[in-house]
């Protein structure tokens, strides 16, 4: 969809113009994805101006680019066995709180399986559950979770990590709030826990945007509306 401000001028769609963008991964932008003839992804480039690309050099651990999955658009699929994409550190260092994530994905289907995590033990993460049950779990030192989790559909989630005032929205509606802890985010891992070989999840990931601020309601709604329309959610 285009964002029209007058009949003769188009502006770039969100998230351009909203300050604080540190990571933007878009599965619908083929120019940002390096894949082989079997559609195995070795690198997914960041569309922000930060250069926070994620990669996987081991061929057997590369996720799969799959076309036409959501609203006719491709996604990146992780197998829940050994797939991951990662970056050891963000340009500019650890992202501290408050920070805001917009993620369009299908959550992993097994408990203690990770969708997005950080590279260190003092980390932020999004996972399907704790060590004993399937839950929607956002964590930055303290579990903030709910058993109301959808592992069947690609949905939009908006996460604000802000200590005791952390929150999550699902499909543009309030979903979860409370204390998620105060950890920052050092680097990023998709499809795996922070330590190698553990917590592999099987998310389908369509798009991720991470900001190093708590966005205003207006900016949050602008990005949510953009992603909802783009991905047919």
Model-identified regions with their sequence ranges:
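Predominantly extracellular/luminal carbohydrate-interaction, adhesion, and secreted-enzyme modules
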Residues: 186-197
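Extracytoplasmic/secreted proteins and extracellular or luminal domains
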Residues: 17, 95-96, 181, 186, ...
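Extracellular glycan-interaction surfaces
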Residues: 47-82, 92, 101-112, 117-183, ...
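Beta-strand repeat scaffolds of extracellular/surface proteins
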Residues: 7-8, 13, 24, 28-30, ...
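GGW-centered surface loops in extracellular recognition modules
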Residues: 2-53, 104, 207, 215, ...
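A general structural signal for short secondary-structure junctions and capping/turn motifs
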Residues: 12-17, 65-68, 91-95
């Amino acid at each position: 969809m285009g964002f029209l401000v007058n009949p003769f001028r188009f502006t770039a769609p969100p998230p351009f113009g909203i300050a604080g963008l540190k990571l933007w991964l878009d599965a619908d932008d083929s120019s940002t994805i390096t894949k082989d003839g079997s559609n195995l992804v070795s690198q997914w480039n960041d569309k922000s101006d930060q250069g926070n690309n994620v990669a996987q050099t081991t061929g057997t651990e590369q996720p799969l680019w799959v076309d036409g999955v959501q609203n006719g658009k491709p996604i990146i699929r992780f197998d829940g066995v050994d797939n991951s994409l990662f970056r050891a550190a963000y340009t500019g260092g650890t992202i501290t709180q408050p920070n805001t994530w917009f993620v369009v994905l299908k959550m992993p289907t097994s408990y203690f399986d990770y969708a997005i995590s950080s590279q260190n033990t003092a980390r932020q993460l999004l996972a399907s559950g704790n060590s004993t049950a399937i839950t929607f779990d956002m964590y930055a030192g303290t579990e903030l979770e709910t058993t109301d989790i959808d592992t069947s559909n690609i949905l939009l989630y908006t996460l604000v990590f802000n200590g005791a005032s952390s929150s999550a929205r699902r499909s543009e509606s309030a979903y979860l709030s409370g204390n998620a802890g105060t950890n920052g985010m050092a680097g990023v891992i998709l499809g795996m826990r922070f330590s190698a070989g553990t917590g592999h999840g099987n998310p389908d990931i369509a798009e991720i945007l991470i900001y190093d601020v708590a966005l205003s309601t207006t900016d949050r709604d602008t990005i949510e509306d953009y992603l909802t329309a783009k991905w047919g959610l």
